A protein has these predicted regions:
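An N-terminal, globular interaction/scaffold subdomain
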Residues: 51-109, 116-117, 123, 130-131, ...
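Peripheral docking tails and interdomain loops at the edges
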Residues: 367-420
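Acidic/His-rich segments in extracytoplasmic proteins that coordinate ligands and/or metal ions
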Residues: 102-172
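Proline-aspartate-enriched helix->loop->beta-strand connector
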Residues: 115, 343-352
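Redox- and metal-dependent alpha/beta enzyme cores, enriched for Fe-S-associated oxidoreductases
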Residues: 56-78, 85-86, 261, 265-331, ...
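Gly/Ser/Thr-rich loops at beta-strand to alpha-helix junctions
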Residues: 55-63, 121-128, 264-270, 357-364
Length: 420
């Protein structure tokens, strides 16, 4: 493959980082996040990394991963460059996330798999294809199955057994085993990170004059990019405090803009097409309902010191099984329930349902979302795309029409309110 392909891999990240840095130049604490994200696209850094554990997606409970590995390396897709590297390795119907993730693991420019065990949750057909390709290429892979039901005791026990079996396999590779002490420490650490995520997003979404939507997404996703979860928490706390100070010192007059809720396929750095389109259409993101934000919303605590590790595992299995979205499942209640929670809390003007081509599990949920939104008088815009940028102009026209419709609705609402 040509070296220009690697340049496009890094250039995509550079372009996004440059845009976010320019638009948020007033935020001193943001610099660490920009540097952290860009490191993920540094060939020298990647060749030096040699992680022991590679995690595809965020379907596997973080509490389990941190109990048996100090520094899991997450692969979340998001890159058009890595997707191109995997074009010849995957069937045409493979979704962009899976193709991009495979490109991170098999490519001619860097190798992060040499000493690594790759773990993956089998939540879709594309994931099954990934496992086959990786094993054929000689990579070490351990898979965790997702049961087709999520509301039965048998499903929970099966899921718990899958977690424990996977943790034991990882522990043999990392030499850090699943003990009660390690599990409690991991639960405490992940809970702190999730609280910090929630505190930051709550502050950032009320400080829209000081930080852009793309910057908010980048900061939260650096939880998965940072070498150290503790370091991410430290810098996120500092940025949150900076935003709180700015909010108190300055009163910015903000233009009336429609607030939209994004749900569906995760929007992952560096491919920030969706927030770009939303901003260009004169709208703002009120919140995000995807697997990343849903994971951060889970509240799992270790309980009292007397609670057994087995009870903690039960709680982890129960919470994550209900939250996980799977194309093999009849109903995915996690995204729907979180959607209703966010709507009640934030009262968004509209919903943008982002679906990556091939991720049919989100299309399965769309009728339920649309029905609930219709009852609440909230318009829904379905946006299906991939990591390519050729459709930007077409999507921009459609998004601007959606934004204008929301604007007109808000104008009518304000007139009715004034005349009441």
């Amino acid at each position: 493959m040509k070296s220009t392909e690697h340049n496009s891999f890094r250039n995509e990240a550079l372009e996004t980082i440059s845009r976010i840095g320019t638009e948020n130049s007033n935020l001193f604490e943001l610099k660490w996040f920009l540097e952290t994200a860009l490191l993920r696209f540094d060939e020298i850094y990647l060749n030096k990394m040699q992680p022991r554990l590679l995690v595809i997606g965020n379907d596997i409970p973080a509490e389990i991963l941190y109990a048996v590995c100090d520094h899991p390396f997450y692969v979340l897709g998001g890159s058009l460059g890595t997707a191109h590297w995997a074009d010849e390795l995957t069937p045409r119907d493979t979704d962009p996330f899976s193709r991009s993730s495979l490109g991170w693991l098999i490519n001619p420019e860097f190798n992060i798999t040499e000493n690594a065990l790759i773990v993956i949750a089998v939540s879709s057909d594309s994931r099954r294809k990934l496992i086959s390709v990786l094993q054929s290429a000689g990579r070490q892979v351990a898979a965790m199955d997702i049961p087709p039901m999520n509301n039965t005791s048998n499903a929970m026990h099966y899921y718990k057994d899958q977690m424990v079996t996977l943790a034991e396999k990882i522990g043999k590779h990392t030499h850090k085993h699943l003990t009660g002490g390690n599990l409690r420490r991991a639960v405490r650490k992940v809970a702190r990170a999730h609280r910090q995520w929630q505190r930051f997003t709550s502050t950032a979404y009320t400080a829209k004059g000081f930080i852009t939507d793309e910057a908010i997404l980048l900061v939260t996703q650096c939880l998965y990019f940072a070498d150290s979860l503790d370091e991410w928490m430290l810098h996120t706390a500092a940025l949150t405090e900076e935003l709180e100070v700015l909010n108190k010192r300055f009163m910015l007059t903000q233009k009336e803009q429609p607030n939209v809720l994004i749900l569906g396929s995760p929007v992952v750095f560096p491919n920030f097409k969706v927030p770009q389109l939303i901003a260009s259409a004169g709208m703002r993101i009120a919140a995000v309902d995807d697997s990343l934000s849903l994971e951060a919303a889970l509240s799992i605590t270790r309980g009292s010191r007397m609670i057994s590790a087995d009870r903690i595992l039960d709680k982890i299995a129960q919470e994550h099984l209900q939250a996980t979205s799977s194309g093999a499942r009849v109903n995915n209640e996690g995204l729907y329930s979180y959607f209703l929670h966010l709507v009640r809390q934030l009262h968004p003007d509209g919903v943008v349902c982002h679906i990556l081509k091939g991720q049919i599990e989100y299309d399965f949920e769309l009728p339920y979302i649309e029905k609930a939104a219709e009852e609440l008088d909230i318009p829904v815009f379905r946006l299906e795309t991939d990591y390519q940028y050729q459709d930007m102009e077409q999507l921009r026209i459609r998004m601007e029409a959606f934004g204008e419709m929301l604007n007109q609705r808000n104008i009518v609402k304000r007139k009715v309110k004034r005349s009441a």
